[in-house]
């Protein structure tokens, strides 16, 4: 039966369409690759053979609508790659800024913690810290972040309340009334990105 079907398929492809399809606009010279793939697909499906892989032209990939994403990859956990699943991937975890930190009880938050992180209000963190750049700068200068690569045991703890009192009672910074960047000779050839360029009378062509 299989040989009969295959020989019929060969004859059909060789001599063209059957008389019943003689009035079709297609001619034997104009049989497209898509028609052949459909025919082969139907024959293989009737024979119980696995479906053949249908490859589409590259320009059809541009017709996709909506967001497209690819999930998975050789870096996501233990996988077995290859056509038979016999190639294990071994990925070493790289250390860097993107590596999630271990926020356990011992080394989770820096010392001192950032103002009142979750669950740390009883450890003496300041609930009402001033929202100023000056306090933030001083706070970060005295902050001891937990860093196992640069963790020096000689660094002592500091008193947050003492720093707060120092910042509160310290001398206020004087405001500048004059912008130092607007002093001096102005550069006329510098044009802002969104402004219309201004040309002097010397640059204009005589009419």
Curated annotation (Swiss-Prot):
Q: Which GO terms describe its molecular function?
A: enzyme inhibitor activity; enzyme regulator activity; unfolded protein binding
Location comes to: Secreted
Among its keywords, does the record have Chaperone? yes
Q: Where is this region: Disordered?
A: 168-207
GO cellular component terms, semicolon-separated: extracellular region; secretory granule
Give residues where Phosphoserine occurs: 136, 200
Name the InterPro entries on file: Secretogranin_V
- The positions making up the signal sequence are 1-22
Q: Which Pfam families match?
A: Secretogranin_V (PF05281)
Disulphide connectivity of cysteines: 116-125
> What is known about its processing and modification?
Proteolytically cleaved in the Golgi by a furin-like convertase to generate bioactive peptides.
Which keywords does UniProt give here?
Chaperone, Cleavage on pair of basic residues, Disulfide bond, Neuropeptide, Phosphoprotein, Secreted, Signal, Sulfation, Transport
Please give the biological process terms from Gene Ontology that the record holds: intracellular protein transport; neuropeptide signaling pathway; peptide hormone processing; regulation of hormone secretion
SUBUNIT field:
Interacts with PCSK2/PC2 early in the secretory pathway. Dissociation occurs at later stages.
What this chain does, per the record? Acts as a molecular chaperone for PCSK2/PC2, preventing its premature activation in the regulated secretory pathway. Binds to inactive PCSK2 in the endoplasmic reticulum and facilitates its transport from there to later compartments of the secretory pathway where it is proteolytically matured and activated. Also required for cleavage of PCSK2 but does not appear to be involved in its folding. Plays a role in regulating pituitary hormone secretion. The C-terminal peptide inhibits PCSK2 in vitro.
PANTHER family tied to this protein:
NEUROENDOCRINE PROTEIN 7B2 (PTHR12738:SF0)
Q: Which family does it belong to?
A: Belongs to the 7B2 family.
What's the name of the protein? Neuroendocrine protein 7B2
Q: To which species is this protein native?
A: Sus scrofa
